[in-house]
Amino acid sequence: VTSLLSPSGKNLSGRGITVGIGDNSEIITPQLDFTARVINRVPFPFSFHGVHVSGTVAGAGLLDPKHNGMAPRATIVSQYQSEIITSSPTYVADHNMVVTNNSYTNANAGCPGEGAYDVVSNYVDKQMGDYEKLLHVFAAGNDGALTCSPFPIKYATIKSGYQVAKNVITVGALDTLYAAASFSSRGPVNDGRLKPEIMASGLNTLSTRHNFTYGTSSGTSMVSPIVAG
């Protein structure tokens, strides 16, 4: 990643790119790492989760250059959870949004909420067919401790709905040994397809906090913004 960001490498900073972030709160813009690069559309006060996810995508690392995000000069459109999906046509037209990060689920808890391709899955698949330059990235879920019969523990635990869609990228978490993290959801989904499509480090991810500092968090919520960024 460092070589991709470096001027002597690919120099991929995210400049000129707009990323949508669907999460549970606004991004508090006094956090220096986001100054002048956030379009807030969330009607809720900031929370740790939303700020941390956003920093992984596009934090500038101004307080500490070692802690910048994957696309430190990208513009962020912040919206409440799945409203980033339903609002995507508007944000594509108004802000040229090309990718979204989605660290949430709309599914029921437990095994009844795993693996189903439903009306929500179909909706997002159709939208991505209509907007060929738009990519949606979703956290797989943290249900790796479930046993959903007839599968053994941890399998068939991808969240239903958006995460099961065929055109999105669903992201799982790796542990420090580069094996699937115990908490990370994984397929197959109900129609037999394999998910997630990709995995990344999901333990103790360091990113922005709301009080002008950095902090760690773990989970697939912290992994999908690595891929989206």
What are the residue ranges of the model-derived segments?
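A short, flexible beta-alpha/helix-coil linker loop
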Residues: 106-110, 212-213
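Amphipathic alpha-helical segments in well-structured domains
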Residues: 50, 117-121, 155, 191, ...
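Active-site neighborhood of phospho(di)ester-bond hydrolases with catalytic His/Asp-centered motifs
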Residues: 101-103, 136-141, 171
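Glycine-rich, charge-decorated loop segments at or immediately adjacent to ligand/cofactor-binding or catalytic sites
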Residues: 142-164
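Subtilisin-like serine protease catalytic core
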Residues: 2-85, 94-99, 109-116, 130-135, ...
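Alpha-helical scaffolding within the catalytic cores
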Residues: 83-90, 153-157
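Extracellular S/T/G-rich loop segment that most often corresponds to the catalytic His/Ser-adjacent loop
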Residues: 23, 157-229
